Regions:
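Gly/Ala-rich beta-loop-alpha elbow adjacent to hydrolase catalytic centers
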Residues: 70-74, 78
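Conserved HGGG/HGGXW glycine-rich cap/lid loop of the alpha/beta-hydrolase fold
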Residues: 1-44
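Active-site loop/oxyanion-hole signature of alpha/beta-hydrolase fold enzymes
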Residues: 31-67
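Short beta-strand immediately N-terminal to the catalytic nucleophile in serine-hydrolase-like folds
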Residues: 68-70, 95
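Catalytic histidine-centered segment of alpha/beta-hydrolase-like enzymes
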Residues: 209-225
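Conserved serine/cysteine hydrolase catalytic core
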Residues: 147-212
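Flexible "cap/lid" loop of the alpha/beta hydrolase fold
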Residues: 83-121
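Conserved alpha/beta-hydrolase catalytic His-Asp/Glu region
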Residues: 124-159
Length: 238
């Protein structure tokens, strides 16, 4: 009997292999599909990144019955991918997507979006300095010592992303889809919690908060894996 297919879409800075390393144990239960998006090692640099274009790029990976999971910028991509090809989606999970526009009017979300706009429009143009500013903003650890070539490539790709805080998420289309949704945050940021709370309400999604790893909730390993596995298995049983 084939295992459920789980497509794991990584976000900014690091590739799929690095983002989802703690999810490798799930390969005993599911077919894990972990692409490295364009602009990330081992591929070359890119001139621009667009979440809607990235959603279309996922089309060949979305076989019928796919469970789509996205972290951060990958969560924004996953939302568009699921709305684009709902007939292929068995479930949708997003982890702290920076879709700040859905929570417009929330003070924390508005402040985060303004800070991101300032960083991208007027921040440092040197990749390492830019990445330090970004990691600080999302409450992620800053590596000690010199940044690796892979991180610097991730920083260059980060700098040319289409702004996710301006994304107009297709909430009505997604709310009308029959597949279950799960929204996860790390309990470290009022802005990300606000986004996730709106997605829970507007999409009729399940909601979970897993503290301890900041923005990179999936790096918790077993607690996240058990949450995701239980959700996928419930979706399979529907």
């Amino acid at each position: 009997m084939p295992r459920p297919r789980v497509l794991l879409v990584h976000g900014s800075v690091v590739n799929g292999d690095a983002t989802w390393a703690a999810q490798r144990p799930l390969a005993t239960r599911f077919e894990l599909v972990i692409p490295n998006r364009r602009g990330f090692p081992p591929g070359p640099d890119v001139e621009s990144v667009d979440y809607e274009d990235e959603a279309a790029w996922l089309d060949p990976l979305m076989a019928p019955g796919t469970h789509v999971v996205g972290h951060s910028y990958g969560g924004v991509i996953a939302l568009f991918a699921a709305a684009r090809r709902p007939e292929l989606v068995r479930s949708l999970t997003v982890v702290e997507p920076p879709a700040l526009a859905v929570a417009r009017g929330n003070p924390a979300a508005d402040a985060f979006a303004a800070g991101a706009e300032e960083l991208w429009e007027h921040g440092p143009r040197e990749p390492e300095a830019f990445l330090r500013g970004f990691l600080t903003a999302v409450n992620a650890p800053i590596p000690s010592g010199a940044f690796s070539p892979a991180l610097l490539q991730g920083a260059r790709t980060l700098m040319v992303e289409r702004y996710p805080w301006r994304a107009e998420i297709p909430l009505l289309e997604l709310a009308a889809t029959p597949f279950p949704k799960l929204v996860v945050s790390g309990g470290h940021s009022a802005a990300f919690d606000a986004v996730c709370d709106v997605l829970e309400e507007r999409l009729g999604a399940e909601r979970a908060v897993l503290p301890g790893a900041g923005h990179a909730v999936q790096r918790l390993g077993e607690p996240f894996n058990e949450l995701l596995a239980a959700f996928v298995e419930r979706a399979e049983a529907r």
